A protein has these predicted regions:
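Glycine-rich, phosphate-binding/catalytic loops in enzymes
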Residues: 89, 114, 140, 160-163
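Secondary-structure boundary/capping positions in well-ordered alpha/beta enzyme cores
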Residues: 93-94, 138, 150
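S-adenosyl-L-methionine
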Residues: 2-73, 81-90
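A short, conserved alpha-helix within the catalytic core of class I
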Residues: 151-165
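Residues lining the SAM
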Residues: 146
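SAM cofactor-binding core of SAM-dependent methyltransferases
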Residues: 61-132
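A short acidic, Gly/Pro-enriched loop at the edge of an enzyme's catalytic core
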Residues: 133-142
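Short amphipathic alpha-helical segments
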Residues: 109-110, 135-136, 156-158
Length: 165
Protein backbone atom coordinates (compact mmCIF):
# COMPACT_ATOMS: atom_id res chain seq x y z
CA UNK A 1 0.00 0.00 0.00
CA UNK A 2 1.41 3.37 -0.98
CA UNK A 3 1.07 6.53 1.05
CA UNK A 4 -1.39 7.89 -1.54
CA UNK A 5 -3.75 4.94 -1.21
CA UNK A 6 -3.55 5.04 2.60
CA UNK A 7 -5.31 8.42 2.61
CA UNK A 8 -8.14 7.38 0.30
CA UNK A 9 -11.45 6.06 1.59
CA UNK A 10 -13.25 3.19 -0.13
CA UNK A 11 -15.46 4.26 -3.04
CA UNK A 12 -18.59 3.04 -1.21
CA UNK A 13 -18.22 5.61 1.58
CA UNK A 14 -20.79 8.41 1.34
CA UNK A 15 -18.33 11.04 2.56
CA UNK A 16 -14.92 9.84 1.40
CA UNK A 17 -13.02 12.58 3.24
CA UNK A 18 -12.74 12.16 7.00
CA UNK A 19 -13.89 15.39 8.61
CA UNK A 20 -13.41 16.32 12.23
CA UNK A 21 -15.61 19.06 13.57
CA UNK A 22 -13.29 19.69 16.48
CA UNK A 23 -9.79 19.94 17.81
CA UNK A 24 -9.34 18.79 21.41
CA UNK A 25 -8.01 21.67 23.48
CA UNK A 26 -6.23 21.53 26.77
CA UNK A 27 -8.15 22.82 29.71
CA UNK A 28 -9.13 22.06 33.24
CA UNK A 29 -12.59 21.43 34.52
CA UNK A 30 -13.30 23.63 37.55
CA UNK A 31 -14.95 22.37 40.71
CA UNK A 32 -18.15 24.19 39.72
CA UNK A 33 -18.14 22.63 36.26
CA UNK A 34 -17.54 19.15 37.71
CA UNK A 35 -20.47 19.66 40.10
CA UNK A 36 -22.62 20.77 37.15
CA UNK A 37 -21.90 17.43 35.43
CA UNK A 38 -23.17 15.64 38.55
CA UNK A 39 -26.20 17.82 39.23
CA UNK A 40 -27.47 18.77 35.77
CA UNK A 41 -25.72 16.24 33.52
CA UNK A 42 -28.36 13.51 33.96
CA UNK A 43 -31.10 15.86 32.72
CA UNK A 44 -29.31 17.78 29.96
CA UNK A 45 -26.52 15.51 28.65
CA UNK A 46 -27.46 13.01 25.96
CA UNK A 47 -25.34 9.94 25.32
CA UNK A 48 -24.03 9.40 21.82
CA UNK A 49 -25.45 6.29 20.17
CA UNK A 50 -25.27 5.42 16.47
CA UNK A 51 -29.06 5.37 16.19
CA UNK A 52 -31.71 7.90 15.27
CA UNK A 53 -32.42 10.37 18.06
CA UNK A 54 -36.05 10.86 19.07
CA UNK A 55 -36.13 14.65 19.48
CA UNK A 56 -39.38 14.68 21.48
CA UNK A 57 -37.99 12.24 24.05
CA UNK A 58 -34.56 13.88 24.04
CA UNK A 59 -36.11 17.17 25.14
CA UNK A 60 -38.21 15.48 27.83
CA UNK A 61 -41.60 15.86 26.21
CA UNK A 62 -43.98 13.07 27.15
CA UNK A 63 -47.29 11.88 25.84
CA UNK A 64 -48.65 10.60 22.60
CA UNK A 65 -49.27 14.04 21.10
CA UNK A 66 -46.07 15.65 22.38
CA UNK A 67 -44.30 17.93 19.93
CA UNK A 68 -41.43 20.36 20.12
CA UNK A 69 -40.73 23.66 18.43
CA UNK A 70 -37.91 24.42 16.00
CA UNK A 71 -34.68 22.47 16.60
CA UNK A 72 -31.39 24.33 16.23
CA UNK A 73 -28.22 22.23 15.99
CA UNK A 74 -25.25 24.02 17.51
CA UNK A 75 -21.69 22.88 16.84
CA UNK A 76 -18.86 24.04 19.08
CA UNK A 77 -20.43 26.28 21.71
CA UNK A 78 -17.18 26.97 23.58
CA UNK A 79 -17.96 27.94 27.17
CA UNK A 80 -21.67 28.25 26.42
CA UNK A 81 -22.29 31.91 27.22
CA UNK A 82 -23.86 32.76 23.84
CA UNK A 83 -25.73 29.45 23.73
CA UNK A 84 -27.29 30.00 27.14
CA UNK A 85 -28.25 33.57 26.22
CA UNK A 86 -29.92 32.67 22.92
CA UNK A 87 -31.74 29.69 24.46
CA UNK A 88 -33.05 31.92 27.23
CA UNK A 89 -34.34 34.61 24.85
CA UNK A 90 -35.81 31.99 22.45
CA UNK A 91 -37.62 29.63 24.85
CA UNK A 92 -39.81 28.08 22.15
CA UNK A 93 -36.76 26.88 20.18
CA UNK A 94 -34.87 23.74 21.16
CA UNK A 95 -31.07 23.65 21.02
CA UNK A 96 -29.20 20.41 20.40
CA UNK A 97 -25.57 21.29 21.10
CA UNK A 98 -22.33 19.42 20.32
CA UNK A 99 -19.06 20.21 22.06
CA UNK A 100 -16.12 17.96 22.91
CA UNK A 101 -14.31 20.34 25.28
CA UNK A 102 -15.18 19.12 28.79
CA UNK A 103 -14.74 22.48 30.57
CA UNK A 104 -17.08 24.05 27.99
CA UNK A 105 -19.72 21.37 28.51
CA UNK A 106 -19.42 21.82 32.27
CA UNK A 107 -19.68 25.60 31.95
CA UNK A 108 -22.86 25.36 29.85
CA UNK A 109 -24.38 22.83 32.24
CA UNK A 110 -23.66 25.25 35.09
CA UNK A 111 -25.32 28.12 33.19
CA UNK A 112 -28.34 25.93 32.36
CA UNK A 113 -28.82 25.06 36.01
CA UNK A 114 -28.19 28.52 37.41
CA UNK A 115 -30.38 30.28 34.82
CA UNK A 116 -33.16 27.64 34.82
CA UNK A 117 -32.94 26.97 31.06
CA UNK A 118 -34.79 23.87 29.83
CA UNK A 119 -34.56 23.99 26.02
CA UNK A 120 -30.94 22.81 25.65
CA UNK A 121 -29.57 19.29 25.32
CA UNK A 122 -25.86 18.56 24.99
CA UNK A 123 -23.97 15.82 23.19
CA UNK A 124 -20.30 15.69 24.17
CA UNK A 125 -19.29 14.07 20.91
CA UNK A 126 -18.01 14.78 17.39
CA UNK A 127 -20.71 16.64 15.46
CA UNK A 128 -20.00 14.79 12.20
CA UNK A 129 -20.81 11.44 13.80
CA UNK A 130 -23.91 12.92 15.42
CA UNK A 131 -25.08 14.28 12.05
CA UNK A 132 -24.37 11.03 10.24
CA UNK A 133 -25.81 8.65 12.83
CA UNK A 134 -28.28 10.38 15.14
CA UNK A 135 -30.15 13.15 13.34
CA UNK A 136 -33.37 12.16 11.59
CA UNK A 137 -33.74 13.50 8.05
CA UNK A 138 -35.26 16.99 7.91
CA UNK A 139 -35.18 17.26 11.72
CA UNK A 140 -33.32 20.57 11.95
CA UNK A 141 -34.66 24.07 11.56
CA UNK A 142 -31.28 25.77 11.85
CA UNK A 143 -27.58 25.25 12.44
CA UNK A 144 -25.13 27.36 14.44
CA UNK A 145 -21.44 26.70 13.92
CA UNK A 146 -19.59 28.49 16.68
CA UNK A 147 -16.12 27.02 16.74
CA UNK A 148 -13.15 29.11 15.72
CA UNK A 149 -12.45 29.00 11.98
CA UNK A 150 -9.18 30.69 11.14
CA UNK A 151 -7.40 30.08 7.87
CA UNK A 152 -8.34 28.53 4.56
CA UNK A 153 -8.28 24.93 5.75
CA UNK A 154 -10.96 25.68 8.36
CA UNK A 155 -13.18 27.33 5.76
CA UNK A 156 -12.89 24.15 3.73
CA UNK A 157 -13.70 22.10 6.83
CA UNK A 158 -16.84 24.17 7.40
CA UNK A 159 -17.92 23.64 3.79
CA UNK A 160 -17.31 19.91 4.12
CA UNK A 161 -19.25 19.88 7.39
CA UNK A 162 -22.26 21.51 5.73
CA UNK A 163 -22.26 18.73 3.12
CA UNK A 164 -23.23 16.38 5.96
CA UNK A 165 -26.30 18.45 6.75
Amino acid sequence: MTSDSANQAPASVAYPKNIKSFVKRAGRTTTGQAKAFEVWGPQFLLKYAPETLNMVKAFGMNGQDATIGPVIFEIGFGMGEATAHIAKVRPSDFFLCCEVHEPGVGALLKRIGEQDIHNIRILQHDAVEVIDNMLPLASLDGVHISFQTLGTSHVTTNADLFKHL
